[in-house]
Amino acid sequence: MLTDVANGDSRISLWLRVREFAVPPSMIETATARRAVGDWAGACAAAGIDLDLDMRSLASGHGKELAARVRADLRHLAPDLLRWHMPRIAPDGLLRPGLTITLARYHAAGLDGPDPVHLVARTPPAWANAGQRIGLALWDGSRSGAGTRGHPHPRPSRRYRLDLHRHLWDARRAGELRIRSGSERPPGPRPPGWEEWGAPATERGCAVERWVEEAAIVLRAEGRSTGTVLVRCGTRRRFLMDLDLSPAPDLNLGLDLDLEPSPGSGAEAHTDFGNGSPAPRITAVSGDDGAFTSLPVLPDAATWVLPDLELIRAGAIDVGRLHPLVASALTPGQARSGPPEAPDPAGRPRIVECRGERHRIGLVGGALVALDHDPAELRREELLVELTGTPLPCLRAIDEAHRRPDCLSGVRERLDHGDIPGALAVVEGLLGPEAVLRDGPLRDELESAARRRIAYGLYRAGLADPSRGRVRADVGRRPPRHRRPRVATFF
């Protein structure tokens, strides 16, 4: 689900930052409250999801019955949960750009073409990823559709799909996460050749113990009882998994999966695994994906260990910091303590060593001021600074806070993940709502975030395409001096 990192500790550290900044508690609370009263559009807005849906056109083009099924799914869509589980890339844990991810497929008679209608989530290209917005649209394979203009990959991805993992976005199915993640089951028998390929893949975070069961779900969804499934585990690691599901193996999933097979495939609408045991054969292969285009692909969500499960097992996260639906699924019956309070609440005075004494700086009248100096003294000191004098340590601390505050890294992370209200709240909590920013890294970060939002607006309007030279190549990027070295490679 995430780009490779140098080692397991780096992976844990990276996912901790993602869980802290990518889906803030305020977003979860607002989206959940709106979904609870049936306002699915408002819930999407709260979760940073743009709607490219025209339900009237869907009903007129594909029938009221199909439109009703889509509406039912939208009413139970938990957009904050979807954002929580979206594929991400290192080093910052941002959304993987340029994806079209199928959430659900709908077959109906009279469609124009062989493809079913897909409910899809789209991430913008990398040059327009400011705000980390997600688009929600419909795709039927027979027309371009809304939200596809300027998108690098408008067709649904075979690897990044969630139609077989509804528990990652559908509130009705969220409880299935415990079973599908393998958190409650002991490791099963290991396939032949485990020491050669299985152990290294497991060390990299692959959920090898789950591959056979998840590959069986993929084959069942295509109405097949035997076949080969391609597994992509990292940048250049490929595995072929040969399965024979006749008679169907008893995989003990404990689920009644609602799968929509292709018309005429002969598969049942519900997958019910029978008795027997699979005899899978897994082999490592080389070559690019072009050599395996005819094979079904194991979804990325089934390839890797669930990040939240990995964090819990490592003792790196408290259950209260997880998404409520994730926490209730992975730790049923355990009380949630809620997010931890900030160690330095907004408005609390800070201590500064000033000329041999301990002075305070804090917020007064919406601005950061020196609390232990009288106004006349401060005016004299400010005048001396204008005449190239040395400012008081209290004034130096205030100036430094306006240019390069201690919270700068947290502000940057929030801006990168699109949490502008959270970033501004941190700044206002430190400097006050009436603060005037001075030249420095903090102001640069905020201005850069504003420029990147312009790039996203151009993308949404279909007015910019960097490949055609219609927008500056650096319009959506942070200035070079703020770039950080990569600690990982893309899948």
Report each predicted region and the residues it spans.
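C-terminal structured domains
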Residues: G234-F491
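Generic structural signal for coil/turn-prone sequence and helix-edge features
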Residues: L95-R237, D242-G264, E268-G356
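N-terminal membrane-targeting/anchoring modules of bacterial envelope and secretion proteins
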Residues: M1-V212, L219-A221, L430-F490
